[in-house]
């Protein structure tokens, strides 16, 4: 799978990591989850990202996860590996290892967290990673998690690097519009905000890297088809019903809500690993009613005001 395959992807699912109650990875649960995603319009899969609880995964666990999912997917959709850290040297070594591992269309590298680099520091960080191997790199810009924000101007400098092929943008629609207007033609722009997918696609984004596609992929697919057919009225109607579901899925630190819904649907998503904890039982029930049944009144007390998936 290559850049060209990624270019065809509209819905890339940021895959959860299923766990047993003891916290170990439930590898037996992965096949059913993958087939569910592929049956419901997932075009690509991101592994070891935020939704996978990557801060709690060991290096060996990530490699085991990569191997397991590659075997199941067997080339049916492109795979992206989460490869970034806040240590440039460590990120370079991981990118090289993933490139040698093979089977990935790209690596997703997050903006460095905690150490709060300058724009020039971030530029040098991503340039060094992209220079290190031939694995194409997608930048993950999410200031809600990492505190600092890669500006559109710095992003466009990086977009000129031949091995930096895109961005997962979680800042603002204004930034996204600017990037889409000024980027190189082949540079991919994805939103990482499920709630912004309607607006992002209308602005000309390439797709969404999504959590909600675990549970609501059909709705997203239908909305994207309506947008492609210039049926804005239909797409907007889908979006109005979709937004409360997104709010519910991010009413507690992700991926706790989506795991609760998947467990209810019969998939063995399992618990989260500490320091993340499940949503309280009554709130989880209300989240499920919204996401599965479209009962929008059920979670009003839980999700009112939660408009952005900063979790």
From Swiss-Prot:
**Could you tell me what this protein is called?**
4-hydroxy-tetrahydrodipicolinate synthase
One biological process term from GO is: diaminopimelate biosynthetic process
Which EC class does it fall in? Answer: lyase
Question: Which terms in the Gene Ontology molecular function aspect does this entry carry?
Answer: 4-hydroxy-tetrahydrodipicolinate synthase activity
Q: Site feature Part of a proton relay during catalysis: at which residues?
A: 50, 114
- Keyword Cell inner membrane included in the entry's annotation: no
Q: Which Gene3D superfamilies match?
A: Aldolase class I (3.20.20.70)
Instruction: Extract the CDD domains matched here.
Output: DHDPS (cd00950)
Q: Locate the residues binding pyruvate.
A: 51, 209
Q: Which residues cross the membrane?
A: none
| InterPro entries hit by this protein | Aldolase_TIM, DapA, DapA-like, Schiff_base-form_aldolases_AS
Location(s) in or outside the cell:
Cytoplasm
Q: Which domain of life is it from?
A: Bacteria
